[in-house]
Amino acid sequence: MDRVLPFRFAEEEGVFWLLDQRRLPQEEVYVPVRTAREMAQAIRDMVVRGAPAIGVSAAFGMVLAHLAGEDLEEADRRLRASRPTAVNLFHALDRMRPFWGDLAGSLLEARRIWREVEETEAAISRHGAQVLWGQVLTHCNTGPLATGGYGTALGAIVEAYRLGRVRHVWVDETRPYLQGARLTAYELQKAGVPATLITDGMAGWLMARGAVDAVVVGVDRMALNGDFANKVGTYALAVLAHHHGIPFYAALPLSSVDPRLASGEGIPIEERSPEEVVAFRGVRIAPEGFPAYHPAFDVTPHRYLTGIITEKGVLYPPFAEGLRRALGLD
């Protein structure tokens, strides 16, 4: 896959360069981040997004805090508050804590986290490719831009295409931030995978016409029973796929599983500014003063899942047993 990575670290400059994903696909612009404060703001503003990529960025945010002489407790707090739903953020910061005050150790651990993301996603792509075929539908963005590695759901799709199993991809535009239209379409085009963009509301009609053979999505946080949070709109896709008898898969690294949660009821759902719904790139698309509601994620019950694609293989029901075993909790 012709990867465009969401970041790079210039150690000699003490700068973490982020590809500003808000400006894609029209422009590929990298912005410099020099402090943990700036990193937290960049994560909040979605300069960088996607659960694994946020985790890697937060880890390097703590490296920047050392380099900039910031208060480490405050830096950690700011980064944790930047996006509440993606559990990878918290896992990465937990791993960085033992290295507070140790710049060299912090840098080694941040690089280790990034390397593990790449290794994990290569495995997810291999396993996921074995269960996808024909025409596949996906939602939001789960490629290298969202992860810093090879991608989760999109990595599996690209590998399945390479193996001759998948022939075409339906890409939900993913309102209101248009991650599908702006980012997934961009990555699939670079990878040379045949794909077609659709509005979110078209998915059910395509399923009814027999034009979808499987659905695969990413995960921002999964509970131990398999309930999971992903970009808002995922729940509707799961219900539609179930109604039409279409396999529905979630692809994720096991680091996206929150072992503290027995079910999806405890997953915090980020609510973003209504302005992101009523306006796009500064252009208002709704009447002035008209209210909007903007939960960034929804929770899909595990009963709608056919399988969970992880770096250790594809898990099938009962998911609680499989996840506990994969996490080494039994």
Curated annotation (Swiss-Prot):
Chain residues that bind substrate? 49-51, 83, 179, 230-231
**InterPro entries to which the protein is assigned, alphabetical:** IF-2B-related, IF-M1Pi, IF_2B-like_C, Initiation_fac_2B_a/b/d, M1Pi_N, NagB/RpiA_transferase-like
- For the site labelled Transition state stabilizer, the residues are 140
Question: Does this UniProt record's set of keywords contain Amino-acid biosynthesis?
Answer: yes
What metabolic or biological pathway is this protein involved in?
A: Amino-acid biosynthesis; L-methionine biosynthesis via salvage pathway; L-methionine from S-methyl-5-thio-alpha-D-ribose 1-phosphate: step 1/6
Entry's Gene Ontology molecular function annotations: S-methyl-5-thioribose-1-phosphate isomerase activity
Q: Which reaction does it catalyse?
A: 5-(methylsulfanyl)-alpha-D-ribose 1-phosphate = 5-(methylsulfanyl)-D-ribulose 1-phosphate
Tell me which residues this entry annotates as catalytic: 220 (proton donor)
Q: What is this protein called?
A: Methylthioribose-1-phosphate isomerase
Organism field:
Thermus thermophilus (strain ATCC 27634 / DSM 579 / HB8)
Lineage of this protein's species? Bacteria, Thermotogati, Deinococcota, Deinococci, Thermales
